[in-house]
Amino acid sequence: MVTQQEKEFLESYPQNCPPDALPGTPGNLDSAQEKALAELRKLLEDAGFIERLDDSTLLRFLRARKFDVQLAKEMFENCEKWRKDYGTDTILQDFHYDEKPLIAKFYPQYYHKTDKDGRPVYFEELGAVNLHEMNKVTSEERMLKNLVWEYESVVQYRLPACSRAAGHLVETSCTIMDLKGISISSAYSVMSYVREASYISQNYYPERMGKFYIINAPFGFSTAFRLFKPFLDPVTVSKIFILGSSYQKELLKQIPAENLPVKFGGKSEVDESKGGLYLSDIGPWRDPKYIGPEGEAPEAFSMK
């Protein structure tokens, strides 16, 4: 079961993925998966949980644990404990990242429009990181708070709006990680943040990666990835693309030219008076046609 408030929210956008989506997603279940879903929900209800028991959420935890019901239950319970301890349920109201306009200059991270499958596209320019300047205006703790803030905004605002725009359930994002200009020292400087961010993503927001493009990858990066591929989950590997400096053609296969920023080979430009590429946050979640009962996505900072 879900709460009445959740029910009204879930009914405001599509709840099934398209038929060609991965097995184990809403609308694409076999009988064994349906049985596992019902079993997991019953176990969690019996344990006293009343929120986040919708099909989409529970199936993400099940997929993350290969439909092992007991392991999925443990993962869900650990996530709920973390949410309570971290204050995740109220972070969109409680946390304000007023230093974001400055941080965007030293570690650009932003969402911009959607890919051909309706996913919000997330850009992270890891090669442009300048930890020395970042440390003058923020801390790793606040950066991680902002990461969780963004995840909650994705779940509560971006994905529902993208689902309405696409006409089917959108559960994942498309990530573009740009390594242009990266050095061993700059990569090492943010390793602690990246490690913690990865832990949060994998354990508390499972199965949110739709496509992952690493562009401007240094020489040897692809070779190293091939060495590790046999140890990675095949489904995860199928979502990851390692590209060098000639990446535009591949990106345009997944992202319409009108949605891909000019700097990455597309045609999308953003007026600096509206925040520019880094701060404008353009997508269906800003379009009144696709905003539902949740309202427009909040801002973590003030543009004033």
Curated annotation (Swiss-Prot):
The record ties this protein, via Pfam families, to: CRAL_TRIO (PF00650), CRAL_TRIO_N (PF03765)
Tell whether DNA-binding is among the UniProt keywords: no
Catalytic reaction list: a 1,2-diacyl-sn-glycero-3-phospho-(1D-myo-inositol)(in) = a 1,2-diacyl-sn-glycero-3-phospho-(1D-myo-inositol)(out); a 1,2-diacyl-sn-glycero-3-phosphocholine(in) = a 1,2-diacyl-sn-glycero-3-phosphocholine(out)
Offer one example of a GO biological process linked to this entry.
Answer: post-Golgi vesicle-mediated transport
Cellular-component GO terms for this entry: cytoplasm; cytosol; Golgi apparatus; Golgi membrane
PTM sites of type Phosphoserine = 302
Cross-link named Glycyl lysine isopeptide (Lys-Gly) (interchain with G-Cter in ubiquitin), where?
42, 84
- Keywords per UniProt: Cytoplasm, Golgi apparatus, Isopeptide bond, Membrane, Phosphoprotein, Protein transport, Transport, Ubl conjugation
Q: How is its activity regulated?
A: The inhibitor activity of SEC14 is controlled by whether PI or PC is bound to SEC14. The pPC-bound form of SEC14 is an inhibitor, while the PI-bound form is not. The phospholipid binding/exchange activity of SEC14 represents a mechanism by which the regulatory activity of SEC14 is itself controlled.
From the record, give the transmembrane residue ranges.
none
Q: Which SUPFAM superfamilies match?
A: CRAL/TRIO domain, CRAL/TRIO N-terminal domain
Other comments? Present with 84300 molecules/cell in log phase SD medium.
This chain belongs to the protein called: SEC14 cytosolic factor
Its taxonomic placement starts with: Eukaryota, Fungi, Dikarya, Ascomycota, Saccharomycotina
What would be the name of the gene that encodes this protein? SEC14
